[in-house]
Amino acid sequence: MKKFLSILIVMLVTGLAVFANDQQEALNFFNSYVSAANSYSPTVATMYSPNAKIIRQVVKPDGTLVNVNTDTATYVKQMRLGQAGAKMRGYKNHYTNVTVTPMGNGAYKISSLRQPSGENYKLKTYMVVKKVNGSWKITEEMMQTKVQTFLRYAK
């Protein structure tokens, strides 16, 4: 019985260490995403799963929220178009209150508050990341925005 309990405890501790490692890896992936995005690196596009769920939650002037969903290919195309102007303006996002929550199945939800350059407000954001074929990918992303032009893509 002692041997069984010892083996069980070792397995539990090992499992927790692997879990903590993956959670830290997910956070490291998020930090590398922020760094790549703020330096306008083309690698940002490769950080998304080809079928990621992309949500832009538009905060209307009256405070109501409208979700605008898009596919990964369209989002990456829009992102590449916007990068040149953002780079010229020195636009960057600053993230605070970053938390990593396990969702099961190897997926982690990384939630944070995003403060755009030159603004004094913070907006909610989250991404769900998962290891796919050995590398971390964004499988879902929700980012609040006050940019009203996204509303024309709402369905």
Protein language model features and the residues they cover:
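Surface-exposed, charged secondary-structure patches
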Residues: 69-120
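A short gly/proline-enriched turn/hairpin at secondary-structure junctions
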Residues: 53-69
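Sec-dependent N-terminal signal peptides
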Residues: 6-10
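Terminal "cap-and-tail" regions of soluble proteins that handle hydrophobic small molecules
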Residues: 23-32, 68-70, 76-87, 102, ...
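Short, low-complexity N-terminal intrinsically disordered segments enriched in polar/charged residues
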Residues: 12, 16-46
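Short beta-strand edge/turn micro-motifs at domain boundaries
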Residues: 97-101, 107-111, 118-155
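Positively charged n-region of N-terminal signal peptides that target proteins for export
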Residues: 1-4
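Short, well-ordered alpha-helical segments enriched in acidic and aromatic residues
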Residues: 40-58
